[in-house]
Every structure is written in C-alpha cells, then in structure tokens.
Amino acid sequence: INRGNISKIFGELITIIENDKRGTEVTLAYSGEQFNVPSNVYIIGTMNTADQSLTHIDAALKRRFSSIEVMPDSSILKKGMKGLPELLDKINEKVREKISRDNQIGHSYFMQDGKPITEIRDLQFVFATDIIPLLRDYFYDSDDDLKEVLGEQFIDWNEGSDRNVKEDWQNNPETFRTAIKEAYHVTI
C-alpha cells in the first residue's frame, strides 16, 4: 500500500471502508451517486517497511487498516536441507545489527515451489542470484558492513578488485559449504 498515493487510489472510498461505515449507503461527494462497501468485503494489501523510498502512510490512513507484521520464520525451513533455518537466523542477526529488523531476509528466499530448499546447488544459486545482490543493495555504500554480514568468502575483497562474486564457491558444493561454515558457523 505504500507503492502509490493511497488517497488518490481509493478516493472517496477511503472514508467508507472503516468498520462503522460498512454496509451504510452514502452519497458520493463528487458524483452524487449512492454507494456502500458491504461488511463482508475485505481489502488486503501489503506494505514494505524496509523500502524508505516509497510513499509514507500517515496515521489517519493507517487507522483504517489492521496491521499484521510478517517477519522471517526460520522454523518453516526445518524440512529443508540441514542447517537452513540456522543460516537464515545467522544472516538476519547480522542484518539486524547493521541496519534494522525491517531489512531482514525472508524465509521465502530459501524456498522453491512453496517448500524449503533441499539441494546444495539450489542454495548456491539463491546465494549468487538473490542473497548477495540483496545484501549489496543494502550496503551499497559500505564494503566494511557488507563484509561483516557476508563474510570474506563470497566476494573478492582484494585491493583494486571490482568486488566481484567469487566463482569457486558457485561451482563447488564443498567450497560453498566451507564458506558458509566460516562466515556463519553453520553446517549445511
């Protein structure tokens, strides 16, 4: 709901979606038409609290909606490969320390087709294509913070390098396992 101007999107509807106005006929100010929102209609939206570039939602608008916070849940990953829940927890612990709890990585990154990842190659792919790019975005102006969250094993940190992702761990499952263990103290 913070991707657009909610007042403009909902228009006059915003005043009649409150619980005490549901099912009551009202005359719309601009068109003069009668309108109501039935009590059994639910408007469900999501809001990304981590993205500061999006539209701010004011208190008057927020009170018209119930909020349910959805945080990463590593327990969902227990049926996946060994160490997967612990890996998510360790990464998020570092993210919380460096940025905020709103920037934690969700458990869905470690799932495929609604199920936790079970194969090392799939986890390598997710790390290369999702986790590292996301962390780079979070820490675009601080190599030191990125290194603290990601460790030294996944990116070439050598002086004068372009900070490219190393290929050795992407192509070798054992090298990847070792990198995870060194960076996060988790055995996968």
Q: What function would you assign to each model-found segment?
A:
Residues 1-188:
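C-terminal regulatory/interaction module of P-loop NTP-utilizing enzymes
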